[in-house]
C-alpha cells in the first residue's frame, strides 16, 4: 500500500507571523500574500510616512526648544493666570506618538523587504490618522502662540547639521537593501542619495573654523540670578549665581507706589509671591500699585517650593529649603549693594508704571537715585532703557549705555551705546563680527544649553545672559569645533563608505536574484515527492514545492498533467496511469 503525503507541508514561521500579525492582524499563513499592495494600502503607507516625518520634525523642535521651556510656561501663565509646566503633557504625547509610528514604520519596511503585502490593521489606521491630525494641530498652535520659537530650529541646524547629515546618510544607506529590491524606485533613490552626498555644500556653521581663531570664553551673566537653583529676583538667587562665577547680574525693575524700585518680572505679584493669601482682593492688581511696606511683607520663596518650576527642589538641601521659604522681594538698592560688595556689574530693564501711578513721570529719576545712593561705581551699571537716555547720560555720564534694539553702528555710536543685548535669534555671526569690529560688545539672551553657548562662543559674542549659570560653568570649551579641512575629510569619507555599501548591496541583490532564477530553470518538477516512504524534512519539501510552482508557470505544465513519485533510495516511480483507482481496476479485470 502506497502512503501519500499532503502537498501543503508548512514550516513554522514565528517571526513572520508576528510581523504580519502586529502590522495587519494577519496571524495565519493563508492570510499572507506576496501580491503587490493595493493603491489603498499604499496610500495608508504614505500617510504613515507623513505622520512619522512630521513627528520627527516636531520631536526635534521640542528637543532644541529645551533652552526656552520656562519662557513657554511663562507665556502659558500670562494667558491662563495659572502656573503649570505645559511641556510635560506635550513631551509625553510626542514621545508616545513617535515611538508608535516609528515601530509601525519598521514593520512596514520589513514587509517590503520580505515581499509581503502591506495591509495595515484598521485600528492602526485610526491611531495613525489621529496622531497626524494632533501633530498638525500642535504645529498650528505653536505657530500662533509661540511663533518666534521656530527660529530655534534654524539656529540649531548650524550646530547639529553636520551630524544630522551623517545620520541621514547612514539611514538611507541602510535602507539601500529595501530600495534595491524595488527596481522601479532605483532611479529615484539614486537622486536622493546624490542630494544627500552634496548637502554639506550648503551647511554653514560658526563651529567650522580654525581653532586659532576662536575667541575668549563668553562671560556669563546671571539672568534674574540663578532661577533654577533659587527663587528668581531674590538675594538667594543672586548669591547662588555669584557662586557660579558670573561676571554680572541681570534684573527686571518696577517702581512701587511710593517710588521704591524693586525687582519683579511679572505685571502682578500672583506668580512669585503669596499675595493671594495676604491681599486676596488685590492679587490681580498691578505690582506697582503696592507700596514698599506691603511688598516687603510678602514671601518670594514659597511659590518656588510649591510649583517647582525647574524640577530642582528635590535636589535642594533642607537648609536651602528653609532659606528659600524665608525669601522676600528684593529692592534695586539691595541688588546694587550686593554687586558693589562682590565687584560685579549690574544690567537691568526698567518698566514704566501705568498712567494712574503717582511716579509715572518719575520712574527714570527714581532708578537713578537708587544708583547714586548705593555704593556701586557708575561704570558697573549697564543702563538699558531708551527713555530719556540723553538726560541719564548727562546726570550720570559714567553709566554703561546698553540697548536691546538692533541699530546701525553709526546710530549706536551717536547714542553712546557700547553694548547690545540681543535675543539669540537676532545674533547672526556676520552681525556679531561687524559690531565687534566697531567696538560694540554683544550680549545674547537667553542661553541655557551647552550647544547654544558653544554656538555663540564660536560666533564671537562677548557675554550671554543665562538662567542656568551652573550648567554653563561646566562648559570650558565648545562642545565641538573643527576646521573646514577636517569637516571636508569626514564628509568625503562618509560619502565614499555609503557609495561602497550601496554598490555592494545592489551587486549582492542582483547576483542573488540570478542564482535563484538559474536554480528554478534547472530544477525538474518530477522530483516533487508524493510518497512518504522516505520522509524528507519539511524545509526541503517546501523548497521543492515552490520550485515546482515557478517551473510550471515558466513551462506551462499543469499540476494535474504530471505527478511523479519520489525516486530516492531506489524506490520506483509512478505515473498517473500507474496509480489506478478501484473503479479502473475493476474495469481492467
Where are the predicted features?
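Phosphate-group recognition and catalysis centered on beta-loop-alpha active-site segments
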Residues: 1-589
Amino acid at each position: 500500500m502506497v502512503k501519500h503525503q499532503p502537498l501543503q507541508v508548512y514550516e513554522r514561521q514565528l517571526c513572520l507571523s508576528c510581523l504580519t500579525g502586529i502590522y495587519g492582524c494577519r496571524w495565519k499563513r493563508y492570510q499572507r500574500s506576496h501580491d503587490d499592495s493595493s493603491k489603498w494600502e499604499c496610500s495608508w503607507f504614505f500617510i504613515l510616512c507623513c505622520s512619522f516625518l512630521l513627528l520627527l520634525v516636531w520631536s526635534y523642535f521640542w528637543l532644541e526648544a529645551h533652552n526656552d521651556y520656562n519662557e513657554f510656561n511663562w507665556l502659558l501663565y500670562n494667558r491662563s493666570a495659572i502656573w503649570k509646566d505645559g511641556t510635560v503633557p506635550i513631551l509625553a504625547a510626542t514621545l508616545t506618538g513617535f515611538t508608535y509610528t516609528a515601530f509601525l514604520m519598521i514593520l512596514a519596511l520589513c514587509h517590503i523587504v520580505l515581499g509581503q503585502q502591506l495591509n495595515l490593521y484598521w485600528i492602526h489606521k485610526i491611531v495613525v490618522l489621529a496622531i497626524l491630525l494632533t501633530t498638525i494641530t500642535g504645529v498650528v498652535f505653536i505657530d500662533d502662540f509661540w511663533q518666534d520659537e521656530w527660529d530655534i530650529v534654524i539656529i540649531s541646524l548650524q550646530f547639529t547639521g553636520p551630524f544630522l547629515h551623517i545620520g541621514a546618510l547612514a539611514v538611507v544607506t541602510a535602507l539601500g537593501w529595501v530600495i534595491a529590491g524595488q527596481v522601479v524606485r532605483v532611479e529615484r533613490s539614486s537622486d536622493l542619495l546624490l542630494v544627500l552626498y552634496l548637502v554639506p555644500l550648503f551647511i554653514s556653521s560658526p563651529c567650522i573654523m580654525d581653532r586659532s581663531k576662536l575667541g575668549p570664553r563668553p562671560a556669563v551673566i546671571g539672568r534674574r540670578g540663578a532661577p533654577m537653583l533659587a527663587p528668581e529676583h531674590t538675594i538667594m538667587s543672586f548669591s547662588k549665581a555669584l557662586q557660579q562665577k558670573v561676571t554680572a547680574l541681570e534684573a527686571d525693575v518696577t517702581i512701587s507706589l511710593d517710588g521704591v524700585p524693586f525687582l519683579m518680572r511679572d505685571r502682578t505679584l500672583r506668580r512669585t509671591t503669596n499675595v493671594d493669601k495676604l491681599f486676596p482682593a488685590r492679587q490681580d492688581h498691578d505690582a506697582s500699585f503696592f507700596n514698599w511696606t506691603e511688598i516687603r511683607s510678602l514671601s518670594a520663596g514659597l511659590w518656588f517650593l510649591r510649583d517647582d518650576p525647574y524640577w530642582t527642589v528635590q535636589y535642594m538641601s533642607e537648609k536651602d529649603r528653609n532659606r528659600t521659604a524665608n525669601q522676600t522681594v528684593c529692592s534695586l538698592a539691595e541688588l546694587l549693594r550686593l554687586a558693589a560688595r562682590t565687584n560685579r556689574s549690574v544690567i537691568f530693564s526698567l518698566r514704566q508704571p501705568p498712567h494712574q501711578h503717582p511716579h509715572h513721570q518719575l520712574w527714570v529719576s527714581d532708578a537713578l537715585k537708587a544708583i547714586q545712593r548705593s555704593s556701586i561705581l557708575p561704570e558697573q551699571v549697564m543702563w538699558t532703557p531708551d527713555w530719556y537716555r540723553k538726560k541719564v547720560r548727562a546726570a550720570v555720564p559714567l553709566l554703561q549705555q546698553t540697548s536691546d534694539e538692533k541699530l546701525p553702528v553709526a546710530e549706536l555710536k551717536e547714542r553712546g551705546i557700547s553694548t547690545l543685548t540681543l535675543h539669540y535669534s537676532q545674533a547672526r555671526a556676520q552681525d556679531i563680527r561687524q559690531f565687534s569690529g566697531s567696538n560694540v560688545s554683544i550680549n545674547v539672551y537667553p542661553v541655557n544649553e551647552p550647544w547654544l553657548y558653544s554656538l555663540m562662543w564660536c560666533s564671537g559674542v562677548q557675554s550671554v545672559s543665562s538662567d542656568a549659570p551652573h550648567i554653563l560653568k561646566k562648559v570650558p570649551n565648545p562642545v565641538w569645533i573643527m576646521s573646514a579641512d577636517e569637516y571636508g575629510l569626514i564628509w568625503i569619507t562618509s560619502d565614499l563608505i555609503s557609495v561602497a555599501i550601496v554598490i555592494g548591496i545592489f551587486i549582492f541583490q542582483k547576483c542573488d536574484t540570478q542564482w535563484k532564477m538559474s536554480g528554478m530553470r534547472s530544477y525538474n518538477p518530477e522530483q516533487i515527492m508524493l510518497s512518504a516512504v522516505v520522509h524528507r524534512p519539511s524545509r526541503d519539501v517546501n523548497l521543492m514545492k515552490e520550485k515546482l510552482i515557478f517551473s510550471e508557470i515558466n513551462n506551462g505544465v499543469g499540476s494535474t498533467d504530471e505527478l511523479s513519485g519520489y525516486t530516492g533510495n531506489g524506490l520506483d516511480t509512478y505515473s498517473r496511469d500507474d496509480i489506478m483507482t478501484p473503479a479502473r481496476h475493476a474495469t481492467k479485470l
